[in-house]
């Protein structure tokens, strides 16, 4: 049996908000395969968000979210990736992940559910395949590495 070190959650967007969470485990294949598959299942209507996190030290309940996590919202063809990571001052901040390239065209709004949506720039839109690389790096390191840039997420009136 695998030691559970991470949890995961899927958010279902249509109708009343529903979520399913539990341990992040690999039944067959690799963790890279698992993360890619979960992100490929996002359709922007029924499955609208996916997140993973490392369990806090000593925690065994996979639904307990630690200080850091990574999440994606949207569809397999166009999704945003956000990560709550530790900063140099020792506190966790939420960031939108983007590529190091100029913004082209107008912003895109990603629908999450009947109560939430997020607007991102063109360099902050990813496919499931692109996002899976970011997710795997986060799974292994609890961080988002180069060549990506992080823009602090504006919580606005939240």
Predicted regions and their residues:
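Amphipathic, interaction-prone secondary-structure segments
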Residues: 43-90
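Acidic, proline/glycine-rich low-complexity IDRs
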Residues: 1-49, 84-158
């Amino acid at each position: 049996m695998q030691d559970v070190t991470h949890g995961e959650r899927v958010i279902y967007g249509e109708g009343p908000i529903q979520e399913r969470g539990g341990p992040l485990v690999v039944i067959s294949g690799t963790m890279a395969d698992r993360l890619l598959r979960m992100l490929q299942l996002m359709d922007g209507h029924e499955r609208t968000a996916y997140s993973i996190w490392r369990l806090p030290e000593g925690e065994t309940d996979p639904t307990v979210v630690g200080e850091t996590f990574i999440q994606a919202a949207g569809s397999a063809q166009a999704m945003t990736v956000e990560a709550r990571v530790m900063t140099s001052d020792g506190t966790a901040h939420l960031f939108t992940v983007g590529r190091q390239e100029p913004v082209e065209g107008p912003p895109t709004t990603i629908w999450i559910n009947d109560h939430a949506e997020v607007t991102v720039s063109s360099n902050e839109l990813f496919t499931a395949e692109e996002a899976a690389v970011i997710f795997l790096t986060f799974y292994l390191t609890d961080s988002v590495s180069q060549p990506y840039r992080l823009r602090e997420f504006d919580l606005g009136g939240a």
